[in-house]
Amino acid sequence: MKLVLNGKEREVQAKNVEALVAELGLPLAAALVEHNGTALLRSEWPKTNLQEGDQLEIIRMVAGG
């Protein structure tokens, strides 16, 4: 299905947010996700199903020092 991910259209296989983060190869504990304008708690990812045309912003947290 096609989603808008960080402002760019992208074809993905994932059916929910948790699977999408895994498909993208991001560490599950180090990502923040906004789905159609709503920030999601980590516990909501497996329950948040994706649909054609959904808009997501995924931010990878990186610590520095």
Residue ranges and their predicted role:
Residues 1-64:
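Ubiquitin-like/PB1-type beta-grasp interaction modules and other compact soluble beta-rich domains
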